[in-house]
Design a protein with these regions (language model features):
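Beta-rich carbohydrate-recognition and catalytic domains
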Residues: 26-173
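Bacterial N-terminal signal peptides that target proteins for export
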Residues: 2-12
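Bacterial N-terminal signal peptides
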Residues: 11-20
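Sec/Tat signal peptide C-region and signal peptidase I cleavage site
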Residues: 22-24
Length: 173
């Protein structure tokens, strides 16, 4: 009789745990932002960590913020995640660290007038060397890896976080 009494709470506990895990697995994007400990006012990505947010700019009525991904906002309270991975190349031996982005209104980089140009750290996993690379976009969402990367290479293990500026400086407030 003792064995049966112990089995019932164990079975109920297992069912309760399974139901909880199942409900958690079915979370949608609306419920993500109601999670405990998730910032409710400042931006946080749907999954993963944001690292160093960079490439913040105001352009054509929207705030644009880049990290490894991209979000847009019209009021700095409500955000639309555009992509979780904005800047990537095709080499699996390369990781990308943050940098900055700018709108090239005068086509000084040669990617087209009004192109988004992102500068970031290119990290070679095997050698641990860091260099600076760029990607460009004509819509601010789909970036093209510049085939001439790296654009600055000191062959150093400590060469991170480039900052670019231009005619489109960040506007806050």
């Amino acid at each position: 009789m003792k064995i049966q009494k112990m089995k019932i709470p164990a079975i109920l506990g297992a069912l309760l745990l399974a139901g909880t895990l199942s409900a958690g697995a079915q979370m949608n994007s609306d419920s993500l932002y109601k999670e405990p400990y998730r910032p409710q006012y400042h931006f946080s990505p749907e999954k993963g960590w944001i690292g160093d947010p960079s490439g913040f700019m105001y352009y054509q009525g929207k705030y644009h913020m880049y990290w490894w991904g991209k979000v847009e906002s019209t009021d700095l309270v409500h955000y639309q995640q555009i992509t979780p991975y904005a800047m990537t190349g095709t080499d699996d031996n390369i990781s990308y660290f943050t940098g900055s982005a700018v709108i090239d209104k005068n086509n000084t980089a040669g990617f087209g007038k009004g192109a988004y140009v992102a500068a970031y750290t290119v990290f070679e996993k095997d050698s641990k060397k860091q260099a600076q690379g760029i990607s460009f976009s004509h819509d601010g969402k789909t970036f093209h890896y510049y085939e001439g990367n790296p654009v600055l290479d000191l062959w150093s293990t400590e060469f991170r976080d480039p900052t670019v500026s231009g005619t489109s400086r960040p506007k806050i407030g």
